[in-house]
């Protein structure tokens, strides 16, 4: 790359008063460091070179009052171009500019501007006008500054709107996060209360079980003497042998019937002379005589009469 220092010698040699002419120097880049060392050079001519860009530190040359960048290949100006607040005269004729940086609105001292022969944005081209003479170039400077201030204001409003949207979104996120945290705190609080209630119930149940176990031996101890000192259960009175007596009576009745039948046969019929009947009659007479004095028979007869 060709620099002014190497092609044109020392810059101080080219300084004429406050004017520094570096035009037609076949420059591909601006010697910013060397220019910064010459604050006296308030008028700088860089026209008719091969500059396609300006470095960002070029905007630090705030001592510049008049700047000629015409007939180069500039496609854009640095974003901080507005730092050149002392600039009054700016020639950008015949470059490749489409737009200007928003900071251009900060060039409050700009009185003269030429933007002819640039592929400007249609809106900016209409604002800049033709700039065919001194008057039109002054009007161009004023109108372009007003336009860039409006663009800057629009961008600032848009920036503020985006910031507001971001703030609202942040507030919503914070509110959502706070609601989530509050919900989590409430959930933890409820779980803690439920756990405490569960433990309390377990504690009460353990105490109740312990009291019940302590009461049990006392109850058994109180019931033990009662079982010893209490009267024995009374045995049910012996049941009367009604059925046995009935069977006995039936047997006796059958026996009596048999005996009576035999007696009748032996006493009434003509068989009483038979040896068997004689024996039967004798036994009968003896039995009747003995039974009349027998205590068992008397007891049976008495029992029967009582029933």
Swiss-Prot record:
Segments traversing the membrane: 245-265
Modified residues (N-acetylthreonine): 2
Cytoplasmic side: 2-244
InterPro entries noted in UniProt: Leu-rich_rpt, Leu-rich_rpt_typical-subtyp, LRR_dom_sf, LRR_domain-containing
Record's subcellular location: Microsome membrane; Endoplasmic reticulum membrane; Nucleus envelope
A Pfam match: LRR_8
Coiled coil: 148-216
CC per GO annotation: endoplasmic reticulum membrane; mitochondrial nucleoid; nuclear envelope
Basic and acidic residues bias: start-end ranges: 154-221
LRR-type repeats, residues: 10-31, 40-62, 63-84, 86-107, 109-128
Residue positions where N-acetylmethionine is found in the record: 1
Lumenal side: 266-307
Gene3D superfamilies assigned to the protein according to its UniProt record, in alphabetical order: Ribonuclease Inhibitor
Positions of modified residues (N6-acetyllysine): 135
Positions bearing N6-succinyllysine: 73
Keyword set, alphabetical order: Acetylation, Coiled coil, Endoplasmic reticulum, Leucine-rich repeat, Membrane, Microsome, Nucleus, Phosphoprotein, Repeat, Signal-anchor, Transmembrane, Transmembrane helix
Feature: compositional bias, Basic residues: 229-241
Residues recorded with modification Phosphoserine: 23, 25
Membrane-related topology note: Single-pass type II membrane protein
Disordered, as annotated region: 150-241
Function: Required for nuclear import of FGF1, but not that of FGF2. Might regulate nuclear import of exogenous FGF1 by facilitating interaction with the nuclear import machinery and by transporting cytosolic FGF1 to, and possibly through, the nuclear pores.
Subunit structure, as described in the record: Can form homodimers. Interacts with SGO1. Interacts with FGF1.
Record protein name field: Leucine-rich repeat-containing protein 59
Gene assigned in the entry: Lrrc59
């Amino acid at each position: 790359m060709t620099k002014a220092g190497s092609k044109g010698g020392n810059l101080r040699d080219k300084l004429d008063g406050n004017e520094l002419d570096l035009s037609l120097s076949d420059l591909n880049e601006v010697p910013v460091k060397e220019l910064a060392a010459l604050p006296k050079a308030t008028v700088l001519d860089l026209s008719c070179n091969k500059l396609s860009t300006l470095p960002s530190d070029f905007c630090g040359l705030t001592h510049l009052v008049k700047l000629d960048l015409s007939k180069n290949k500039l496609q854009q100006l640095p974003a901080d171009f507005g730092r050149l607040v002392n600039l009054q005269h700016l020639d950008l004729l015949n470059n490749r500019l489409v737009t200007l940086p928003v900071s251009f609105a900060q060039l409050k001292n700009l009185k003269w501007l030429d933007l002819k022969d640039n592929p400007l944005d249609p809106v900016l081209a209409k604002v800049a006008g033709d700039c065919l003479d001194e008057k039109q170039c002054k009007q161009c400077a004023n109108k372009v500054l007003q336009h860039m201030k409006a663009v800057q204001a629009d961008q600032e409003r848009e920036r503020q709107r985006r910031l507001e949207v971001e703030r609202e979104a942040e507030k919503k996120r914070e509110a959502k996060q706070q609601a989530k945290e509050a919900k989590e705190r409430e959930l933890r609080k409820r779980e803690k209360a439920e756990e405490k209630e569960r433990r309390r119930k377990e504690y009460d149940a353990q105490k109740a079980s312990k009291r019940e176990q302590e009461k049990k031996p006392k109850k058994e101890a109180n019931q033990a003497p009662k079982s010893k000192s209490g009267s024995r259960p009374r045995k049910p009175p012996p049941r009367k042998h009604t059925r046995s007596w009935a069977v006995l009576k039936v047997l006796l009745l059958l026996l009596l019937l048999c005996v009576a039948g035999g007696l009748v046969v032996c006493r009434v019929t003509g068989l009483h002379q038979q040896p068997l009947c004689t024996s039967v009659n004798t036994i009968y007479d003896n039995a009747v005589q003995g039974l009349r004095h027998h205590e068992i028979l008397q007891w049976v007869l008495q029992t029967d009469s009582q029933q």
